[in-house]
Amino acid sequence: ILDLSGEIALNNFRKIRDLTLKGDFSPVTKADEDIEQFIRDKIFEKYPNHKIIGEELDDFEGSENITWYIDPIDGTRSFVAGKHDFGTLIALVINDELIGGVIDCPALGERWTSFSSNATKVNQKITKCKAVDDLKDAVMATTSSHEFGMKKWRAYQSLEQSVKVTTTGSDCYNYGLLASGY
């Protein structure tokens, strides 16, 4: 599924001319919708009763306690701006327990997978977070600090001053890098 959804993303990458702003002013493209629909269709082929919650399309309630979460293009702003650090996120939850998830960054050729019974992998190689005992040695990654209200902004600034490095943007790619120990 991810190889093919990645092809949809790459076939649209740096070709986006139109986008729509959602109610929260975040952008969505036809590629977002096409990728999510493709992933949903593939899930429905095998699991027609599973619940699906997606970023762009209406939720499907399903009749089982199995839920798929889909963000077809995490980092749509990066995608629209021609930056390579966007990706597709998929998570599987059964009976309110996270079973696993995937971060797929097709333009970078990197895919992180993590399932409860296995180690986290990037491109099929085992990886792990860096152990940090002191906050001053930590790396902090966030989507954007501009989305915080004043109270959260103050907390963010305090935390930012307490860590070794802060990086913003890059959405899911940052989280993959953290999972790889960077």
Listing of model-derived features with the role each one plays in the protein:
Residues 1-73:
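N-terminal subdomain of lithium-sensitive/metallo-dependent phosphomonoesterases centered on the IMPase/IPPase/PAP
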Residues 5, 9, 32, 43, ...:
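Residue-level signal for inorganic ion chemistry
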Residues 17-19, 120, 162-168:
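Short secondary-structure junctions
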Residues 32, 79-82, 167-168, 172:
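Short glycine/threonine-rich catalytic loop with a Thr-x-Gly-x-Asp
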Residues 63-121:
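DPxDG-like acidic metal-binding loop motif
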Residues 122-126:
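A structural micro-motif at secondary-structure boundaries
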